[in-house]
Each structure stands twice: as C-alpha cells, then as structure tokens.
Amino acid sequence: MQELQQKIEDLETKLAFQELSVEELNQEVIKLNQLVAKQQQQISLMVNKLMDIEPSNMASESEETPPPHY
C-alpha cells in the first residue's frame, strides 16, 4: 500500500511540473503571437510607404535601349 501511495505522489508531482511547464509555454506562445502581429503591421506600413514613393526618373528595363551588340 505504501508503494502505491508513493507512486501516486510521484505522479502528482510530475503533473504539477507539467502544468507549470504548459503555462510557461502558453505565455511564450502568446508573446510570440503578439510579436508576429506587430511585425505584420510594420511590414504592411513599410509596403504602403514604398508604394507611395514616386517612381524614379530612370527608365524601366523594358524602356531601355538595348546595348549596341544586340
């Protein structure tokens, strides 16, 4: 009977540590999700800023005169 009680206590201890680990991992996942959301927002803002930049005066590749060897 004593052995069974010891096994139960060991299992309860392991369960408590696992619950703590799961909670810590959950908090990390929440932080990472927030970070990803912030980075997505920043990327979106950067894309919008890049699209607002006026095109340069340089001709595009399709408008360039081919080099003389063509």
Curated annotation (Swiss-Prot):
Q: Name one Pfam family in it.
A: SlyX
- Record field: transmembrane: none
Give the source's domain of life in one word: Bacteria
Name the HAMAP family on file: SlyX
What the record says about family reads: Belongs to the SlyX family.
Can you say what this protein is called? Protein SlyX homolog
**What is the source species?**
Shewanella denitrificans (strain OS217 / ATCC BAA-1090 / DSM 15013)
